[in-house]
Amino acid sequence: MGARQEPLTASLRRARAEGTGTGLMFIPLYDSNHLRSISLQYVTFALIAINVLVYLSTTVGGEQFTNAAMLGLGFIPSVVHDTAELAPQFVVIPAKLSYVSYAFLHADIFHLGGNMLFLWVFGDNVEDALGHVRYLAFYLACAVAGALVHGFIAPDSQEPLIGASGAIAGVVTAYLILFPRVKVWILAFARIPLRIPAYIVLAVWILSQFVLFLMGGEDQISWACHIGGILAGAVLVLVLRRRGVPLDDEEIVVPVAADAGQPAAVEVPPPAPAPRWGRR
């Protein structure tokens, strides 16, 4: 079992898993990518709603209540690995369940907003490509993978890991693999609007996570959690995607006649799903 430390009673320092882990390098706004197989992204909506509700419920009681929630529901490697224990008043769930519960906690409105914005922009198409049930399993598995890697890198940490970005990193990686050529509207450095292919902006984001992980990055951000989500997302999307879903999709652009009788290329909604990429 190993030597136990004194029960943890107050761990105000949090190892946050930031959804926009490169600061304000870019803010995603919108993608030109229509749903092909589902009519509505129910799971993505539900995940956003749950994250918002959990945030509100854990902050309404003041700082003391918030800290207690972070201790009871956050992922604390030393507690999970049984080298430390929580004081009894903070034990809310079995420690192993914190591999998932931590992903629904956020430190502040900016932490929550950044993660949910990424999920809003990229989650719907990944849900479309995987199907509702498999997408939910994918999301939770990426969250677990983020906690696993964080716990492997810092097994004796007594700081609660919180934030959805292990799961979000998996979603972003899956989007890059499935839709590399789709154009994404972003605000670069929070002020410059750009419309660029996903394979540029998302590949740069993923690469930056590895660079920051290797360099150490900010002390309060768990880059290891991001790496776990990225690796899980890259593997699981290949296994869980619907049959017939390609790995190199793109916007559909076709030539149409302009009013003046001259051809012009415009973006149009995709046709009805083919049997290989249809509803299930």
Segments predicted by a language model, with ranges:
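A detector for small-residue-rich transmembrane helices and their helix-helix packing motifs
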Residues: 2-280
